[in-house]
């Protein structure tokens, strides 16, 4: 039976490159030169933004978002927390989300069922497996999911006949 998986994955090398580009851009910006830092933690997939003032944090976050877009990484995967004061400086944490949580998986399954397509969707950990009798039905399911707006970027892989 033909099937495919709906996943939400990040290319970790591209994320690292985007953060490196944001660091270089921060050094080039005259208004932010020497006033802020990006600290990327590879294991946790988080970026700690540090600046003197809160408006500088907002500008740094915008630099990071632009760097992600240039590297073709969807900014929906970036989850930011509220800024907080730490001594004389302000800090803000940004986390890269990966994987489909249960709530999003349920929305995906409900969307497929509401589409009344001849496919079945099953939640398997951090992915959703969609199976059907015909390849065309699966392609319709992919088209349906692409038209909907979800709070995470979705990829379709492991397409099997």
Swiss-Prot record:
Nucleotide-binding protein. InterPro entries: DUF520 (IPR007551), UPF0234-like_C (IPR035571), UPF0234_N (IPR035570), YajQ-like_sf (IPR036183). One of its GO terms (molecular function) is nucleotide binding. Belongs to the YajQ family. This is Nucleotide-binding protein PP_1352. Keywords: Nucleotide-binding. One of its GO terms (cellular component) is cytosol. It comes from Pseudomonas putida (strain ATCC 47054 / DSM 6125 / CFBP 8728 / NCIMB 11950 / KT2440). Pfam families: DUF520.
């Amino acid at each position: 039976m033909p099937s495919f998986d709906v996943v939400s994955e990040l290319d970790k090398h591209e994320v690292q490159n985007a953060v490196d580009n944001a660091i270089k851009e921060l050094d080039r910006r005259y208004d932010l030169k020497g006033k802020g830092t990006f600290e990327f933690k590879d294991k946790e997939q988080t970026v700690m933004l540090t600046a003197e003032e809160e408006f500088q944090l907002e500008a740094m976050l915008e630099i990071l978002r632009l760097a992600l877009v240039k590297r073709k990484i969807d900014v929906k995967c970036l989850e930011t927390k509220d800024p907080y004061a730490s001594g004389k400086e302000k800090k803000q944490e940004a986390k890269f989300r990966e994987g489909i949580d249960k709530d999003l998986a349920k929305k995906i399954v409900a969307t497929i069922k509401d589409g009344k397509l001849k496919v079945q969707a099953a939640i398997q950990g951090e992915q959703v497996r969609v199976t059907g009798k015909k390849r065309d039905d699966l392609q319709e399911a992919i088209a349906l999911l692409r038209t909907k707006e979800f709070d995470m970027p979705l990829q379709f892989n492991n397409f099997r006949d």
